[in-house]
């Protein structure tokens, strides 16, 4: 099992094509668009598709040999304002104060600006590749020196792991929806570019579905009794690219003067 997973990850890394680095700065920007409330109080993320991208392929949902929807492919997030996570987060007073203090310093201490892992769900503005098998699903992200997440299917959480940047993810299929359950985070990441904090009690549930060939829909629920007053759910839609490859992104190479980051 471990050897198989290593092979999947290694294969995904070995065949990267070093063409060019893509700037992903939308998270701190103000993308234009209309904010829409989704069904049942779920809020859709404000965003506008990049008109320079070709339209996604058209066709029915592909299926794997085990009959489950095949989520494999390279997925792009379009030109989204990823600081917007479906409206204001339900932060407790102390967490709201921390976020405001970070904004006042123009996010000078953002861990991602220091080439540290973005965490979940913040990592998703970057293009990512899904490699799917019946036992494990791997997401390889273009950003942050190729962070990856692995979802082991049909097993429980490991109670003996130390908290980590990306947490520990397990997954299961509920009909045609892949449900990813992630816990055991450290408290070092920001939830968004505006500096929203969380604690080690953060629990993230992602529900992925592929309604057709060209789209991957994600419904994300975050709960953190240490920092939130209630759970928060929002949606994102990713589009399949038939031409994109995961490009080399060496954050540390260009981030050579961290002590002089713009900020206050």
Question: Where are the language model's segments positioned?
Answer:
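Bacterial N-terminal signal peptides that target proteins for export
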Residues: 1-9
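PEST-like low-complexity, intrinsically disordered acidic/proline/serine-rich tracts
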Residues: 5, 13, 17-264
């Amino acid at each position: 099992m471990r050897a198989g997973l290593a092979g999947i990850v290694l294969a995904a890394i070995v065949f990267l094509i070093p063409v060019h680095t893509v700037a992903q700065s939308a998270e701190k920007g103000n993308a234009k668009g209309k904010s829409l409330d989704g069904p049942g109080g779920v809020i859709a993320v404000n965003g506008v598709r990049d008109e320079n991208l070709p339209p996604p392929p058209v066709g029915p949902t592909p299926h794997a040999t085990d009959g489950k929807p095949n989520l494999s492919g390279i997925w792009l997030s379009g030109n989204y304002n990823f600081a917007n996570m479906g409206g204001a987060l339900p932060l407790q007073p102390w967490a709201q104060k921390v976020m405001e203090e970070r904004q006042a310093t123009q996010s000078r201490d953002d861990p991602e600006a220091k080439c540290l892992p973005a965490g979940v769900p913040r990592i998703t503005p970057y293009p990512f590749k899904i490699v799917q098998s019946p036992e494990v699903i791997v997401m390889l992200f273009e950003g942050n020196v190729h962070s990856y997440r692995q979802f082991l299917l049909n097993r429980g959480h490991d109670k003996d792991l130390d908290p980590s940047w990306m947490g520990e993810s397990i997954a299961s299929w509920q009909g045609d929806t892949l449900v990813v359950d992630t816990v055991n985070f450290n408290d070092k990441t920001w939830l968004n570019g505006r500096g929203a904090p969380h604690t080690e009690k953060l629990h993230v549930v992602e529900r992925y579905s592929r309604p057709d060939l060209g789209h991957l829909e994600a419904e994300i629920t975050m709960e953190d009794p240490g920092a939130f007053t209630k759970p928060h759910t929002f949606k994102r839609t990713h589009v399949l690219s038939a031409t994109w490859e995961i490009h080399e992104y060496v954050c540390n190479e260009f981030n050579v003067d961290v002590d002089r980051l713009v900020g206050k």
